[in-house]
Every structure is written in structure tokens, then in C-alpha cells.
Amino acid sequence: MATSVKRKASETSDQNIVKVQKKHSTQDSTTDNGSKENDHSSQAINERTVPEQENDESDTSPESNEVATNTAATRHNGKVTATESYDIHIARETAELFKSNIFKLQIDELLEQVKLKQKHVLKVEKFLHKLYDILQEIPDWEEKSLAEVDSFFKNKIVSVPFVDPKPIPQNTNYKFNYKKPDISLIGSFALKAGIYQPNGSSIDTLLTMPKELFEKKDFLNFRCLHKRSVYLAYLTHHLLILLKKDKLDSFLQLEYSYFDNDPLLPILRISCSKPTGDSLSDYNFYKTRFSINLLIGFPYKVFEPKKLLPNRNCIRIAQESKEQSLPATPLYNFSVLSSSTHENYLKYLYKTKKQTESFVEATVLGRLWLQQRGFSSNMSHSGSLGGFGTFEFTILMAALLNGGGINSNKILLHGFSSYQLFKGVIKYLATMDLCHDGHLQFHSNPENSSSSPASKYIDEGFQTPTLFDKSTKVNILTKMTVSSYQILKEYAGETLRMLNNVVQDQFSNIFLTNISRFDNLKYDLCYDVQLPLGKYNNLETSLAATFGSMERVKFITLENFLAHKITNVARYALGDRIKYIQIEMVGQKSDFPITKRKVYSNTGGNHFNFDFVRVKLIVNPSECDKLVTKGPAHSETMSTEAAVFKNFWGIKSSLRRFKDGSITHCCVWSTSSSEPIISSIVNFALQKHVSKKAQISNETIKKFHNFLPLPNLPSSAKTSVLNLSSFFNLKKSFDDLYKIIFQMKLPLSVKSILPVGSAFRYTSLCQPVPFAYSDPDFFQDVILEFETSPKWPDEITSLEKAKTAFLLKIQEELSANSSTYRSFFSRDESIPYNLEIVTLNILTPEGYGFKFRVLTERDEILYLRAIANARNELKPELEATFLKFTAKYLASVRHTRTLENISHSYQFYSPVVRLFKRWLDTHLLLGHITDELAELIAIKPFVDPAPYFIPGSLENGFLKVLKFISQWNWKDDPLILDLVKPEDDIRDTFETSIGAGSELDSKTMKKLSERLTLAQYKGIQMNFTNLRNSDPNGTHLQFFVASKNDPSGILYSSGIPLPIATRLTALAKVAVNLLQTHGLNQQTINLLFTPGLKDYDFVVDLRTPIGLKSSCGILSATEFKNITNDQAPSNFPENLNDLSEKMDPTYQLVKYLNLKYKNSLILSSRKYIGVNGGEKGDKNVITGLIKPLFKGAHKFRVNLDCNVKPVDDENVILNKEAIFHEIAAFGNDMVINFETD
């Protein structure tokens, strides 16, 4: 379809706007047939201005394939040959070369900022030397039985941190003793790869127990772990004594902790208190923010590694049946085996560091990247994103420097820069499967390194993350769950796309943005599961029965077992409705006093190490709302899959016949407007398979859903927020009218009828409801174009009258041939200085309204001619008028078509933008911010989600919008949106095509052309720079929101008062800070939607004569939600003039007052009285801000154009009392209260 304006006129428009306002035009007046306005936004990152330097590093991946051979650049059958592919590849490499230099400068600056202070390092090293001397003073301890150990510690401060199960003297026939350990530093501090951490860092010190303390079979049944616990307790006891002797006990605190949250690995943590008069010492390292971990390790290969492989059982238990085999004990085996490998891996990494100049810098980048996404080396089997921290990242990088490919080819080279090393590891994580389809093998033994086999990727997966060391037989990724690995892989993929993005600067998103501070931003849905857990002996019978001896052996702790069980149950129940699941044991602790044996052992019973379970989901938007969970097909003999399905779902399972004739086992779910289907599934599955008494809380989800106005339609309470049927009904009504008008016999044929109303793009706050004519969005705008004609008048006023004549003719035809349609005319004042615009308002028999306005090929030409012929002092006003015309007539078509497509691609965009509009209207901002601007701001988290995922829930999308606004420095940063559908992300396809030398088909080329190119992006940035050069503080124009549709960036954001823009930012910051400080709950959500009226200079409370809630098409909260409101109008009034009786007069009143007092006041009100106007929809408010110029006295001028009164002979002040009386008089009987500050 095409708009009516000729291309020549459009080019004239572009040239004039660039020349006069230094901005590009937004509308390519003709719209190509079938063009898709899709969207993939780009968050405007503050680009650092740096000089271009010579490239000292290549950003070419070592595994990149050769470019296709050069062939003739001919195009046939929609194909692009390899020559053009090569040209694209070269252009891309040029952009990447420049980006690589920029990244290098940013990385250098970042590394400098996080570098440890040398004086802090020296300070803590001084204490480490002292600690070494103290440890050497601890006396040896002869062999003791367990009974003697218990007797020794009976009256001591220190308790032995035995791991569960605690040994019993009569069953323990091995001895415990202490001999001096071998002491060494390990970890990042030893590698000099440590960085400054705001919450402090830890230094890992390894104390290796002598080999003679162990027997050959101590690796079985916790024996070596119990020996370590006694060894640690004895060391702690004497360390306390020696610290007191050296007068260091006044500022040093000792406590036990589980290293990496592994309950099988207790350590001693030493920290400092703040220096006081009594604790001043050269050894006090409090200001360094370091703590010291004393790890008790085993000698290297003290136990035969093969006996501790992940598939072996090393915990023997009594079996009820001899035929029953004991399960593997991978967690236990890893804990024992890894305790003997600390020093080995330090040597391995140190050797790699010496060979690779940028190894440490790349390690720091990896650490920052992981920390910002919530990953660590902690055990993830009891929840959290653990199992992959700095240590695992460095081991993987070292392995890839020695191979890593399918043919043992090197993935990384020792001469790579830190950026290339980091990108190489990220690419490997993103593209290689180390869980299901394969694993990576490497050799860490530093001996005979010249002949050491290379790392190799093996096409054999073990269904668990695997990075296997052939030297030590350790799977480095044992601590990582499948769920944690899947999320890591997805983050790596997202980061790789950001690294490959040559258009936008993504440095901040990759390294600087912490996405783990607030779960509701990181995850789409969060459910708090309260389990009936008390003391261990009181554990609910059904839950205890599933945690038998076999489960204890495999999972070690109940926390690990519960996390595994809940994950599996939720994953099976939700299937492809979700992408990822993460379990968190809220309240889990790893630190405990040296006076206690373990965490929570101080309460006289075995309490569990968590308060409740939080289930965190990342949703698949395209599948989450389906009504049916389909299982296996039905057959005469029940298959294993069918039996599992029926057993899992129980009474919910049923047989259903589908349209294709198949009969399938399935579960059918009901929808609700107050919560997603996923909530029902989670409740059912967890209560059935985990605990009948489990309490699953999701009140915040319901709260956000309930803030969306419920349409007064049948069964609306049972309709999902993703359901667009009410919008489809309106579109169907429009289609019928569309056909009627197209068939009319008019002097000029109708060329196109283009809908541009917000309901056509599914973004109107209130859903379309028949006969709801009190809704401000009831009349949906439509652009009507006729065929080209040279007879259109050559003057704007005459042209508008000619348009009106055509609309009159349409009304006559409609009245004569379609009597069920009713219509009337109204004057349109949306374009300043053009008061001759008339619109035709048509009411359909289905109960919907449409407002038709006419566009011709002459309009744009006449507006531009008026600007060219005007005096210089009048041109700014006329240019602003032309912008309004462009936005209303030309750009609105592309905007509507683009967002309509995007609403289908991003399922949650529609409800999110509608909720965002309600928030804006609650705070009286929507009257100043156009619908289009609100819609473009709300689309940012969808088209440019980095570093987060695309929103998969209403609350997640809404909170991300607020988060973006709170961080958007619109004075310095433009918002540039790449409006492309998510499935059109063909960067990976593009790279694969280039690398393989294959041809790019026309479809791929079209998708490439739809994205913003680097030149277009830089052009938009130049427009923003020009704008800020003329308006550096954003006084006249604050929000620069640009896209391919609107490279000028100002179409929808011009005319917003500065106080309104700053208030929007301030409100978003307050909202985000409130939620991060106090969490997401019913109270904080209510506060989000509570306006702060005390900030205004005056507030006028209004009440309309009649309530408008029902006539706005909104179902009242007090009514039964399964029936409609009978008081709502079911037809239009006989006299169409009566329509205005049920429309909110506040809008016209505020519009008039803003025109009258535009020089001195900024007035605001709520636009949607049916939504925010109280229970009946009859309450509104007018708030006023006095402009700063009129806050105090100033000199009198003739052209002040406002009501003032004299202070003295020269100065005047605003006559507020007179203005307030005038406003009250205009409001008349509607005013019920008038407050001033």
C-alpha cells in the first residue's frame, strides 16, 4: 500500500527539515507494498569519543572458515554470489576493526578501575606472612580415636565441623591426628588476577594435609572428610590461642564457612573488624576489604582418581535387596577428588599465564561478565546460578589455548589480546554443547607439557555439563546443574551477538550492567514456595518418603534433593512454555560460628538451611499461553510415555480428539485475566509431586494483571491478557466499513484507507468495547486517500474545504446505501494554525467508531511552500506545524503498521504498553506525552533487551520499561530503535553463509536491508548531535527517539515541557529504587500507581455529573467478573449530539486552560477517567505547575502575556489568586476542592 504523497514531495520535505531544523524528515511519503516495519531496538549507549588508532590486534576468530572463492558477481534466481558475500564480509571486518580498537580502550579503562590498590596488597601480604609463622607454631597431635577427639573438644570453644552424617564413636575404627601442613596461596590472588570488589574479596590459602595422615580407603564413606573436619577444628583451636598470645584476637574474627557452598568442604574464614583504639595494629587489614579462607586440602593423587570417577559409588550403605545397585555419588566424589587438585590447577594456570600475555586481563573480563549475570563457582545443586565462576572460566580458557576443537585444533592462540580471548571463550560457550551432545577433554598435568595431548571436543554428551580433566579425572563443571548451564549458554549467545554488533556500542551491557540485583527484572515469573518444613524429624511424611537412603547418597543434602526435584517437576509440567528455570533456596547460609558443628545446628534440632524456595522462570512467550498441554498419542496398548504422562498429571489427564483426527493424552487449562496459565500449572504440579501442603505465592503477578482495566465484555475475567480478540472485533468492523467505502462511486476513486488509531496496533489503554463512547480512544483515526488529481486546490484552506466536500459525499452515500451506519462531522484542531480540518466520524452497527481524515498529494507541498514563503520570525512556528502534520498524517501510517507487526512478534508488548500508559495516566503525564512516544519507549525492552532477555510476562516488561527510563540520560543519549522482529535476527545465518562460502538468498538480503546500517545509525547520531548543539540542556526538546521510520527523532517528542520530562525520569527512579529497596509486594505495587500530588503548586479536584466507568467499557471491580455490566450502553443515542453528555469534559477544559495560560502555567489531568477516576469513574484532578520565570517578582514587560500584579513601580508577580479564581470559574460545578501550596 502507498500513501498519497509523491516521492518528490517527500524528498522536498527531507531537504527542508534538514536545512531549517538540522534534522531529517521522518516519512518516506510513499510506503512500499508489503514492506514490513519490524523492530529490534538499540539502547542508546553513551559512546565514548576516542581517536581512531592503528589496529594492534585482529578480531578474526581462529576457527573462522576461509571466505568463498571469488566468482562472477552475477545475480540470478534471487541469489547473491560469493563476490558480493565477500564484499559484505570485508565491510563487516572494517567495522569490527574499528570496534575492536574502541573496545580495547574501554577495556583498558575498565581494568584500570578494578585493579587492586598496591598498598592494600602489601598490607594483607604482611598479615599472610605473619599467619604463616603462626601456623608453623601449631603443635602436632598424636593419633586419637573419635571418642578421644570428642573428649578433647568437649569443653573447648571450638566445635568440630563434621559433615553429615556425623561419625559415631562405636562405628569409627580409624584415627585422627594433626601434622604440619604444606601452606600455599591459590586462586585469583595467587595468579595476580584479583580485582577490587565493593563487598570485599577473599584470599584462598591452601593447607595440604600430610600424606601419612591417610589410609588407602579413606576416600570411602566420608572418612577423609571427617579427618579433615577434625584437622580443621584442631588448627582453629590452636590458632585462637596463638592469636591471643600475639594480641591479634582483638580485631580478628574466625568463623567456619562452606567453600563454594559445598557442605562437604568446611573452611576457616579470617576477617578483620574496624580498627579502634585497642585494636590498632600493623596487621589489621580491615581497610583492604579482604578476608582469608583457610582450605584444608589433600595431597595430589593421595587416592586413586579412577575410583572417584563421577559414575562410581563411594558411599556404601545397607541394601534391602542384593540385586539393587548403589547409585553413583558424583557430588561426593568431586568434593574428595577436587580437594587434592588445588595446587595442580594453580600450576596449570600459572604455566598458561606465562605463555599468554593477556591471560590475566581476559580472566578479569570473564570474572566481571559472570558476576554481572549472577554466576559464581558456588555449588548450584541447591539453587543459584553456580558451578561456573572465575576458576571454571580460566580453566576453560586454558584448555582452549591448547586445542578444544573437534580435531583438537586450537580455538585460542597465545598471542591473542584480552578482547579476543574473552570473545573466543564466549563464542565457544555459545556454540558448543558441553552437556547433551558432547564434552571437552583436556590435560592439566604440567609435567611433560611438550608431549601433553591437546584438548579435544568429543561428540558424546553425558546429559550433565562436562569439562573433563584426563589428568586428574575431575569434571570441572560438576558443581553446575543442567539448568544453570542452559542459562549460561544463552547468556553467552546473547553476549556473542552483542560483541558482533558493529552498529551499537554494547560495552556497558556486557561488563557494567548488573542484571542480578532484582529477580523480577532478570526473570519473567517468580514463585515463592513455602514448604511445611520444621525440624527434620517432623518433615512431612510424603516428602520424607521420597528422600530415602539412596537419595541421601546421591544428593548429599535435602536442599540439593529438593532443588533437583522441584526443577524436574516444573520442567516436565511446563515443557516448552518456559525456556529456563532456576531454583533459589532463600535464606540459605554458608557461614556459621566456630562454636557450632554446622549451619543451624544451634537450635536443638536439624533445621534446614533455607526459609523457602523461590522458583524463577524465563518464559517462552509464544508458547506460555496455550490452553492444552499435549502428551503422547493414544494407542491400544499404553506406551511408557503415556503411562508417565497419566501418572504425572493424574486427574487432569484426559483423552482429546483434535482437528487432524488424532487422539492424544492431554491436559486442558483455563485462562484468567488475573494470572497466567503457568501459575495454575505450577500450583498443581508442585502440590501434587512435592507437597500437598506447599503454599505457592504469586500475589504480585495478580496485582499487576489487575491494574489492566478489564473490558466490559462477556467472560472478560476468564480472558488472558495476551488475548487480542476485542481488538480483532474492532478490526473486523472496520474491514466491513472499508469494503463499503471502497465500492462507493465518488468523483475520485478511493486509493487507500489506512487505519492509524492505537487500537489497530493493540496499544490502546482500554480494550475496544462496543458502544463505549466515553472512552477517549473510542473514535479510531483513519487516513483516507483518493487517486492523484491535478485539480486539488493550491491553497491549504481551499484544499481542506475540498476534502470536506468529499467527506460529505461519503456521508451521503453511506446514509443512502448503508442505513445501519451513522455519522457526523467534527472539527479537528490537532494541526496548529489549520482550523479548517474536518473529520467524518462514523458509527458502525457493531458499536465501534472511526474518525476519517483525508490526505492528498498536495498537503505536504503546501505546508513546505508556506514555510519557504514565511518571514524568518514565523518559520519556527510553521516548522513545528509541519512536524505535527507529518506525525499525524504521514508517519502515523508506518508507525501503526510497524507496531501492529511487532505486537504479533512480541506477545507481551500489547499488555505491557497498556499498563505503562496506565502508569503514565495515574501520574498525570499521559496528557503531555503522545501515545506514539509512550509506545516507542515501551518497546525498548523488546527490541533491544540486552543485557536481559525479551520480556515474557506483564510485570517483567513493565518493570524493564521503568528501569530503562530511570537510567536514560536523555540529555546525552538518544534512543535509537531498530524496529525488526525477533525471528529476523539473521546475524548468525549471515556469518554462517559467509564462512561457508554459500550464496545469500534474496530473503536474507532483504532482512539485512531492514536493519539499521552503521551509516544510518551514525546519521541518526549526527542528528542528535546537531540537536544538542542548538539545545545542549534539553530545554526545548528532551526525548530523542529515532528509528528507520523517523531518523529525525523528534516527531513524537516535540512540545513536551521540560518539567514533565524531568518528572517522568524522577518518578521512574523513585519507582525502581522503591522496588529494589523494599521488594515487590502488594504495598510497593500500590505505591507505584499512587500519584504524588504534593509536588504541584495547586490541585483542583473535579467530579463529573455522571460516572463514566461503565460507558467507557470498563468492568467495575465491585461487579461479578463473569457477567457484563447491564448499565453499560448497548446502543448509540438517537440524537448524536447527546454523545458529548457522557464524555469527560476535563480534557477540553485543560486543553483550553493550557492555551490560555501557556506562558505561565503547566496544567495536567488524567486522560482516562474511567480507569483512574475512582469506583464510578467520576473523579478527576487538574494539577498546575507555575513556570520558574513566574515563581518570583520580575520586571514588567509589555509582551508578558499573563495575568500579573504590581509589586512596586518596576516589578510584577504572577497574579495567582486571580488565575485560581478564573480556573475555578471555568470548572464551575465540577470543582469540589481547590488546594494551593
From Swiss-Prot:
Chief location bin: nucleus
GO MF term (any one): RNA binding
Domain of life where this protein originates: Eukaryota
Subcellular location: Nucleus, Nucleolus
Any Pfam family the entry gives: Nrap_D5
Keyword annotations from UniProtKB, A to Z: Nucleus, Phosphoprotein, Ribonucleoprotein, Ribosome biogenesis, RNA-binding, rRNA processing
Keyword Transferase attributed: no
Annotated positions of the Phosphoserine modification: S10, S58, S64
Residues found modified as Phosphothreonine: T60
One GO term (biological process): regulation of ribosomal protein gene transcription by RNA polymerase II
Region (Disordered): 1-78
InterPro entries given in the database record: NOL6/Upt22, Nrap_D1, Nrap_D2, Nrap_D3, Nrap_D4, Nrap_D5, Nrap_D6
Comp. bias intervals (Polar residues): 61-78
GO cellular component, as recorded: 90S preribosome; CURI complex; nucleolus; nucleoplasm; nucleus; small-subunit processome; UTP-C complex
Family recorded in the similarity comment: Belongs to the NRAP family.
Assembly with partners or alone: Interacts with snoRNA U3. Interacts with MPP10. Component of the ribosomal small subunit (SSU) processome composed of at least 40 protein subunits and snoRNA U3. Interacts with UBP10.
Miscellaneous comment in the UniProt entry for this protein: Present with 3260 molecules/cell in log phase SD medium.
Function: Involved in nucleolar processing of pre-18S ribosomal RNA and ribosome assembly.
Protein name per its UniProtKB record: U3 small nucleolar RNA-associated protein 22
Annotated organism of origin: Saccharomyces cerevisiae (strain ATCC 204508 / S288c)
